[in-house]
């Protein structure tokens, strides 16, 4: 088989494997319900301009035309929804759809993550960075086809801003309730921005032995991680292993590390998928979604020939 593959198949792969590729494509179309009896294929369907009558009659499309571009709107999200210097949003945001009044509507969506690269000097010591500023806060969405008002004058700072729907620790706005995008657990411990630390040390040490919470939640409250993630570092052997990995003696010496402590690491959702399923080819971006009241990261993965 190896000789056949090397001297016959590889030099003529397109011809030799065309039959099997065709079967794969046919099976994929069948699995996704894209067979010819269900889908009509039209050549050059967009070559002719649409008439005014056709545009006027296509209410579903026109009413959902995007006014917000997820590739360029991130600075506006940051300016209006960052809240604290240590929170942030990715440079490029994502699109998602939610069922509003029995219709799927486009939203620009983002998770308000901890940004380790935005911490001030007094926030960068080991205790603050790895045991206090551990998680993000909330889900922010904006209808892609809406802005607050039209900017009527050139250079005007009024109008053209997103209409935000916010669910976070401080509030769940009425708009979120009406649209059904309500988050029951707004704390975010994993995400691409969280994992973007320039020194590669994106880990967080969580868990309390005394019941005293130390993780920053809001200006008036703290929190202790209650999730199932992370690795137990309550014993000296695990502490030593992670201390060696990150070249950090505080993991052994600090009183913040106790018998109930866990370490959260490898916090980029896409990289986590690569670790457990290296045979998958993943999309270059991940995006957050509200599912059953929780913020979850969607990673699109594909098997390839």
Locations of regions flagged by a protein language model:
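Soluble extracytoplasmic regions of secretory-pathway and membrane proteins
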Residues: 1-305
């Amino acid at each position: 088989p190896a000789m056949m593959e090397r001297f016959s198949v590889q030099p003529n792969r397109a011809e030799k494997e065309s039959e099997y590729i065709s079967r794969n494509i046919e099976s994929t179309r069948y699995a996704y319900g894209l067979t010819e009896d269900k889908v009509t294929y039209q050549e050059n369907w967009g070559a002719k301009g649409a008439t005014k009558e056709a545009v006027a009659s296509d209410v579903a499309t026109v009413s959902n035309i995007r006014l917000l571009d997820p590739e360029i709107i991130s600075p506006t999200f940051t300016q209006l929804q960052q809240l604290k210097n240590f929170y942030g949003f990715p440079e490029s945001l994502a699109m998602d759809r939610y069922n509003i009044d029995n219709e799927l509507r486009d939203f620009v969506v983002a998770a308000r993550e901890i940004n380790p690269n935005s911490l001030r000097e007094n926030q960068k010591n080991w205790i603050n960075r790895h045991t206090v500023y551990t998680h993000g806060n909330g889900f922010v969405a904006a209808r892609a086809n809406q802005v607050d008002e039209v900017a009527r004058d050139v250079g005007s700072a009024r109008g053209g801003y997103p209409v935000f729907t916010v669910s976070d620790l401080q509030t769940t706005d009425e708009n979120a309730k009406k649209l059904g995008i309500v988050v029951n657990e707004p704390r975010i411990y994993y995400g691409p921005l969280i994992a973007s630390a320039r020194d590669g040390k994106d880990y967080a040490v969580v868990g309390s032995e005394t019941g005293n919470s130390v993780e920053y939640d809001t200006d008036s409250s703290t929190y202790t991680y209650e999730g199932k993630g992370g690795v137990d570092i309550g014993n000296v052997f695990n502490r030593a292993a992670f201390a060696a990995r990150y070249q950090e003696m505080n993991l052994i010496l600090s009183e913040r590390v106790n018998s109930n402590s866990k370490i959260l690491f490898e916090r980029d959702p896409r990289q986590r998928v690569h670790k457990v399923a290296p045979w998958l080819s993943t999309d270059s971006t991940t995006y957050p979604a509200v599912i059953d009241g929780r913020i979850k990261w969607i990673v699109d993965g594909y098997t390839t020939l």
